Every structure is written in C-alpha cells, then in structure tokens.
Amino acid sequence: MNLSKIGQFISRRRMAMGLTQAQLAERLNVTDKAVSKWERGKSLPDVTLFSRVAAELRVSVVELLSGELMNVVRSSNLDEAVDWDGKAAQATPLTLHRDDPADLLVSPYLFGCNLEHTRSCIYTGLSAQMVRNRKFAGKPTACEGCAIEWFPLGERGVFALDEPYTRHGEGYHMKRTLECNSVGIFNPYCGEAVGMGQHGITISQGQPYLFGMVVKTQESVKFTVSLTDRTGKNVYCRATSVGGGDDWTRLEVELTPQAADSDADLRICWENAGYVCVGAVSLLPKDHFHGMRRDVVEAMKDLGLKVLRWPGGNFAGEFNWMDGLLPADMRAPFQSYLGLETQPHTMGYDFSEINTDDFIALCREIGAEPFITINPCWNTPDENAAWVEYCNGDVSTPYGKLRANRGHQEPYNVQFWSLGNEFGYGHMEGDNTPAGYCQIALENGKKMLEASPGLSLCSSGPYPNKEWAEFSAKPLAGIS
C-alpha cells in the first residue's frame, strides 16, 4: 500500500471537489492537520473513515486505497460521468504491493471497538438484564415512596428506602450519593396483597426467563411473581416461592410466558402481614451468556472485532474493578460524574452488570483481544496493579490465586492496558494538567509493570496538543 500515492490522490480529488483541507476536515469531523498528514503520505485515515472519505471525494473505497480512478460504473450519487451500456463494467483487479519503504505494516488489531459499560450500550444493549433500576438507586418517588421505575401494588402498603443489600468492594474511594438502597414494604393487614411492579418489560412467547430476588423478612413469606399485561388482568405466567428470614436470602423462579408482549408488567406480591425488605431484583433470559444477550454477542462475533476496550471510555473513571468480585446482585450502582450523560438512559446511575471475568469470556467468545482501561483517579497504583495481577498472575500470586479460586485457573494474559481515559478534558475527574496526569500515569504504569512485565500501556491526553506531547507523552515514552 503506497501511502504517498494515496496521499497525492486525496489531494487531487479534494482540489477537484473545490475543497480546502480545512473544509474536508470539517466534513469528516477531523483536524486539518490530520488531512495534511494524509496528503503528505504520513498516515492513512482511520479505517472507520474510509467510506466517508471516499464519499466526500466521490470515489470508491477501492479507488481510494489504490490511489487512482478506475473504469467502473459509479453510483448516481458520485458526481462523475457513468459509462453505462446496460451491463455493469468489470472492476479492475487491485493488487497491493509492499515495496515502498514508506509503507506501514497494518496491525491485526486495527479493527476494534470501545465497549463503554454505561447507558444504552449496556442497558437494552449488551446486558441481558431486563429490569430497570433493579437495585433501587436514587431518590424514591415523592408521593408513593417507591423506588424510581417501580410502582406499588396494594392499597395499604407502606413503602420506604432501607439499609442496602448492595455495597462496593474494596478500593472504592469515590464521593457519590444514593447509590445503595433497598426497598422496605410494610403490610399492616394479613390477607391483603402488597408488593411492587415494573412496566415496559419485553417478553417473547415460550422463552424461559430466570427471576431472582434478594429479600429479608420478619418471617417466612410466600411470594407470587407474575408476568402480565399492563393492566395486570391478563397473566402470561406465574410462579411462587417461599422463603425469607433475618438474613438476606435469594429466591429464584423460572417464568415462561404463553404470549409475547413488548409492554408487559413484572409483578411481585405477597399477603403476609409484616415487613419485607427487597435488596435487588433480576430477570434474565435463560440462555444469557455471562449476563449478556446472546444475539448481541453473536452480532459482535460477526463483526470480526480483533480488539475490545472496556470498561470505557468515560465510564472507566467511575468503575471500581474490585466491585466485580462481588455477586452481580450485590454490586452497588455507580452514580455518574456527568449525570446528564446517563440521565436519559438509566437516571444518572450505572449498574455494574459485567465484571472482569465476564469481559474476558466475551473477548474469547468473539475472538477479540482484551484492552482494559484503569481508573487512575479513584484507584491507587497498588489497586490497579492488583487488577493486572488478577488478570495475569499465576496461582502463586495473591490475586492470581483469587482468580483461580473463582474458577479461572489459567491467567488471562491481558496485554493491552490504557492508563485512564481522555485526561486533559473537563469531563474526566482527576489532575487534567499534562504534568499532573504524567505523574499519576507513571506511578500506575510502573506498579502495573512490576505485576506483569512486558505490558503494552497506552497513555491518555488530548490530541493534537504540543503541551501534552512535551510534558506528558515524552516523559511517558519509557513505559507507554
């Protein structure tokens, strides 16, 4: 692939279109410096831009990468004459030669994706979890006392938020509010049904679902769990479970609806008098993959991703990896630093549904190399080094032994690690000066390399920016 030839081709086509470098850059949402580098043969557009660059230059992607126009039939949206004789002309075969010293080897990891563990990327996206606000984060509704996204059942039940079942793991240092709650429901009259429900559950006919609920009660209680229409009159399926007690107990039933409904209700009720505390609720398709949707996992596999970055993105600045060592129901929600980003999706909170083990399982399933972003603002260098050890250490190390005890004997051997995300911008917490970030990144990177020498570390910062290049990228060159 001749970068110089491609660059000259881009330059000729741009001028033929009557565009300046700045105008082309604006259309592609890149910097004019990036366009200049393409035209000088110093780099190529990102692979995700190939189609857009070709469209702006009124050429095909094949022509763009070959650096020359070809005798092919063009779509009517390409402002070129069409040589049309009733049959499509045969495209000229394209041969790429690596005989130019300026050519670059294309990395097998060129095509990747950023899996940000937040918003609709997870809820209604990758996560198979069907219940919204399943751990009752945030303030309750003003009039009813029921958690947001839930509605009360029964005429005389009393609702209040109570001491939580959820909690954060070790290494949690962030300052957030209303992340951990449970819902307490008092029924003053035996024989009268009380409970809680949620609208807007999408169910498929004949599809089995796994329901789970963590409760604490004054005595053994018979719970009835139903999937119904929005009115509650048409019951698609129903199951009961008896349990409870002074300690938190997880109750489980399987539900298989006899009809499909894109706006079904999940309803949980009981008739025992007394107090019931609900710590978490879960509803998953029985065929889920580590808590993830099978159809989305298969689609990711079909994409052919070769590297997958997680947990972000901006969310990496909220994430505490040690929370993932807790059971999924017990992991506390995260209140977003930028609530405006998550408010339309999950009311300002994110729910820690996927942990490190799940992410590695996903990467192996789709054939992608894992690329993990640490949280250098809220986790210490030792805590981030422990994450590396959990992934790459053998059973002789404390965290390698912990991974093995959790059912994963062999190290994950995660090679690629990002030292934070987008430092230098106001939407990320922490020291956003070049020198300040550099110091944090150095401290974390050195500890991580002690835990697993030979890692490929990626530093963060705004690009292009001379100050960051001088006072951050250069000093970090020894480790990243």
Regions found by a protein language model. Name each.
Residues 1-16:
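A short, Lys/Arg-rich alpha-helix, primarily the initiator
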Residues 28-44, 66-69:
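Recognition helix of helix-turn-helix/homeodomain-like DNA-binding domains
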Residues 271, 311-312, 397-433:
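Active-site groove signature of glycoside hydrolases
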Residues 18-37, 52:
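Short alpha-helical DNA-recognition segment
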Residues 60, 78-352, 369, 385, ...:
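Extracellular and organelle-lumenal recognition/adhesion modules and their flexible linkers in secreted
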Residues 264-268, 272, 433-480:
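Noncatalytic carbohydrate-binding groove/subsite architecture in carbohydrate-active enzymes
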Residues 48-63:
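DNA major-groove recognition helix of helix-turn-helix/homeodomain DNA-binding modules
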Residues 279, 409-427, 461, 469-480:
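Aromatic- and acid-rich polysaccharide-binding/catalytic face
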